């Protein structure tokens, strides 16, 4: 198993992706002194008995209520218990672990004032596979992801439940005991520090971002295969066209499409004498649409990388002056905007793919392919309903792509009068990824079927490798059969990265690299 060293403020996107995939996590030792200094600063504030929000006051609208020193531990426990009011299905274990790692990185910067032993417990839970059961609904993305993070913190104090990969639920105290850990007694500010923050929204947004990156690469492969199946032109991918417009994503996706189609005998067969002047937009404008999606994902990636390496607690502790300053870093507007960007990109990637599927099944548009890609149309329906399925999934994603960040609703007796809705905006991304991956899977099957009708002509070497990998899992459709297993098998190849791997061509990604 790979391992990621969390150096607070310095974790690249690749590190967060590895953690989501199950990498082991350890906190870099360099951050330990800062954690201790911030905890000492909080202890000094308690000793001075000066009023500081969240340390010796109530919370939210109750911030003006002073709390006696004898009740400070109860105050922190109470905020956890009262705020653990989430509902809905639990977070996926992988995303919950990513949320915990993000919280660990935030606490490790020494601006939250939690004790070293509190950080050590969270670190040990990650190392020993203790994952809190966190209901996924209940956050509005300000003041932080309170309800979800309260469920995480509840497990740390032995309350609530934990969950494993199989979905088995275990009482939190028992889950801790099984691996030799003891529930935590929270110190001053610690309950608030663990609850305040955008880690729930950021974890979901990162998971959606990484899924979108995988999707975009698979969609480029599918789009190239559709160009050959429809006997389309590669002229629109000429680098001179894209250099004049200057958009980086457009330039890179055009290059990827050229690389994928290079050497295609299908393309060579109609270079001369083809009376079609221009292909439909779904083939011809792939660099413009996919490049714009790539640029949008990169903007979102930059925002999320910054957020993942920042501190979104409140108040923030500055040990050098002994101050605890109240602000609004918990407001997840940057995450909400990033999630909306990802949703728009996901929607458009799927929408363009569905249009290519529609082209391939329509004999009026597909340049000689049989209706619905079946040898005997009429007796067989072929790809008629898979295209309908793709249309349904794309339309569902269009509804989900409505920006979440434009919504707001006042909470906490109007003290928290503007919220980001980042949690909802980020949570919707994984279902959108799944929908879009299913659409790409349908396109791959349709494009491979279309190329089968062009035999003995062959596509390029990269695309022939993709066809071979696809045909190893899904045979050619010569007559109607129960279709669902074909779709499931193709979707599994897309989801698992086998399609991109088979192509063996460098494809652009969100961090500027290729894979």
UniProtKB/Swiss-Prot annotation:
Residues annotated as coiled-coil are: none
Q: Answer yes or no on keyword Transcription.
A: no
Q: What is this protein called?
A: Histidine ammonia-lyase
EC number(s) from the headed UniProt entry: 4.3.1.3
DNA-binding among keywords: no
Q: What gene name is listed for this protein?
A: hutH
Species this protein is from: Methylobacterium nodulans (strain LMG 21967 / CNCM I-2342 / ORS 2060)
PTM per UniProt?
Contains an active site 4-methylidene-imidazol-5-one (MIO), which is formed autocatalytically by cyclization and dehydration of residues Ala-Ser-Gly.
**Where does this chain mainly localize?**
cytoplasm
């Amino acid at each position: 198993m790979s391992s990621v060293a969390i150096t607070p403020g310095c974790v690249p996107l690749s590190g967060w992706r590895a953690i989501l995939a199950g990498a082991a996590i350890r906190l870099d030792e360099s951050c330990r002194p800062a954690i201790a200094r911030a905890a000492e600063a909080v202890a000094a504030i308690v000793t001075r008995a000066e009023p500081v929000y969240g340390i010796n006051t109530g919370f939210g609208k109750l911030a003006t209520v002073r709390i006696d020193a004898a009740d400070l531990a109860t105050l922190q426990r109470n905020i956890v218990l009262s705020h653990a009011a989430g509902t809905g299905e639990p977070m996926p274990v992988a995303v919950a672990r990513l949320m915990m790692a993000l919280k660990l990185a935030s606490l490790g910067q020494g601006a939250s004032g939690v004790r070293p032993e509190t950080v050590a417990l969270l670190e040990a839970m990650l190392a020993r596979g203790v994952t809190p059961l966190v209901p996924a609904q209940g956050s509005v993305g300000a003041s932080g992801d309170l309800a979800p993070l309260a469920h995480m913190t509840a497990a740390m104090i032995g309350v609530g439940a934990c969950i494993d990969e199989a979905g088995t639920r275990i009482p939190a105290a028992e889950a801790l005991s099984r691996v030799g850990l003891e529930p935590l007694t929270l110190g001053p500010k610690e309950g608030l520090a663990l609850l305040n923050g955008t880690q729930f929204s950021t974890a979901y947004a990162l998971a959606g971002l990484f899924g979108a990156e995988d999707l975009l690469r698979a969609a480029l492969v599918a789009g190239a295969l559709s160009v050959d199946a429809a006997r389309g032109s590669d002229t629109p991918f000429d680098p001179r066209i894209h250099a004049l417009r200057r958009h980086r994503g457009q330039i890179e996706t055009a290059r990827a499409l050229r690389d994928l189609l290079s050497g295609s005998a299908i393309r060579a067969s109609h270079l001369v004498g083809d009376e079609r002047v221009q292909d439909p937009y779904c083939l011809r404008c792939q660099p413009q649409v996919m490049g714009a999606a790539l640029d949008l994902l990169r903007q979102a990636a930059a925002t999320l990388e910054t957020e993942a390496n920042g501190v979104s607690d409140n108040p923030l502790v500055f040990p050098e002056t002994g101050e605890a300053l109240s602000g609004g870093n918990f407001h997840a507007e940057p995450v909400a905007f990033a999630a909306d960007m990802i949703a728009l990109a996901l929607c458009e990637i799927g929408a363009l793919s569905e249009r290519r599927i529609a082209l391939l099944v329509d004999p009026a548009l597909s340049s000689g392919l049989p209706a619905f890609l079946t040898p005997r149309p009429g007796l067989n329906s072929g790809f008629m309903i898979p295209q309908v399925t793709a249309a349904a999934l794309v339309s569902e994603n269009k509804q989900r792509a409505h920006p979440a960040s434009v919504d707001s609703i006042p909470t906490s007796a109007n003290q928290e009068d503007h919220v980001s809705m980042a949690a909802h905006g980020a949570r919707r991304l994984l279902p959108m990824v799944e929908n879009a991956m299913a659409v790409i899977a349908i396109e791959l099957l349709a494009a491979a079927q279309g190329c089968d009708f062009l035999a003995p002509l062959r596509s390029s070497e990269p695309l022939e490798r993709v066809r071979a990998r696809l045909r190893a899992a899904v045979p050619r459709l010569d007559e109607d059969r129960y279709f669902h297993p074909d779709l499931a098998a193709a979707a599994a190849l897309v989801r698992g990265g086998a399609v991109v791997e088979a192509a063996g061509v460098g494809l652009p990604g969100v961090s500027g690299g290729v894979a």
